[in-house]
């Protein structure tokens, strides 16, 4: 069990299974969730993004959607442990099943930390559960974007974390599915290295206007977390 150091929230995770990384923390921080918003988190894993959003905002409800049953079970146990079951729920569904997505009441915000790697690229993790989390096995990038559009109310927004080498694909597929890119932020390991994470906000049926946010640098010159990251973790 991991302590998020946020309102006493703890998240149940397996030591030898998929564990959340800084990308999920960055995504939860990047998402603009307003008081009373209803939120869906796709590819939710063990629920780190919903739990951070619950701790930092006054969202009225947060639903995590995850295809792997054991992760859903752990996430719901975490919700009960933190006495957040009235605010957060996790359901085991396939986001490519658009009929199911259409049955979910439309929301103000969708967040997603999808598999980054194409199925036929790199070495596929021998553990199926790890591979599903990292490779486009159960869904691809367009499936994710279509699900986001299906879940969003008119003019409401999605937030995604991904890899910069897929940015052209992300923007192309967002526009194909009438989600307009509105805000992009690059994340670099440090000031000397190229970005390895991209955060992007899109608006369903939005007008054309794109804002570039200042970059985030994860580590400082001494090898410790930067002031930006310390602030995101609530330590500054």
Regions found by a protein language model. Name each.
Residues 1-34:
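Class I SAM-dependent transferase core
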Residues 9, 37, 60, 86-88, ...:
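A structural micro-motif
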Residues 10, 138-188, 193-195:
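Conserved Class I SAM-dependent methyltransferase catalytic core
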Residues 18-20, 43-46, 192:
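Short glycine/threonine-rich catalytic loop with a Thr-x-Gly-x-Asp
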Residues 30-123, 146:
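Conserved SAM/SAH cofactor-binding pocket of Class I
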Residues 114-143:
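Mobile active-site "lid"/loop adjacent to the S-adenosyl-L-methionine
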Residues 192-236:
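SAM/dcSAM-binding transferase cores
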């Amino acid at each position: 069990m991991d302590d998020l150091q946020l309102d006493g929230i703890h998240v149940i995770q397996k030591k030898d299974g998929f564990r959340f990384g800084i990308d999920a923390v960055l995504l939860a921080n990047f998402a603009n969730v307003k008081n009373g918003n209803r939120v869906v988190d796709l590819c939710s894993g063990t629920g780190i993004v919903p739990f951070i959003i619950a701790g930092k905002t006054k969202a009225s409800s947060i639903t995590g959607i995850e295809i792997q049953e054991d992760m859903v079970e752990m996430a719901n146990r975490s919700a009960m442990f933190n006495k957040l079951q009235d605010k957060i729920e996790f359901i085991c569904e396939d986001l490519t099943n658009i009929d199911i997505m259409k049955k979910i009441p439309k929301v103000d915000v969708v967040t997603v930390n999808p598999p980054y790697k194409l199925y036929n690229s790199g070495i596929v993790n021998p553990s199926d559960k790890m591979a599903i989390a990292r490779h486009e096995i159960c869904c691809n990038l367009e499936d994710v974007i279509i699900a986001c559009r299906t879940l969003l109310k008119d003019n409401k927004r999605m937030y995604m974390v991904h890899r910069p080498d897929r940015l052209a694909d992300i923007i192309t597929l967002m526009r194909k599915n009438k989600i307009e890119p509105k805000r992009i932020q690059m994340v670099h390991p440090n000031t000397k290295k190229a970005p390895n994470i991209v955060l992007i906000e899109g608006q369903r049926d939005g007008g054309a206007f794109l804002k570039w946010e200042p970059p985030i640098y994860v580590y400082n010159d001494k090898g410790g977390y930067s002031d930006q990251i310390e602030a995101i973790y609530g330590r500054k």
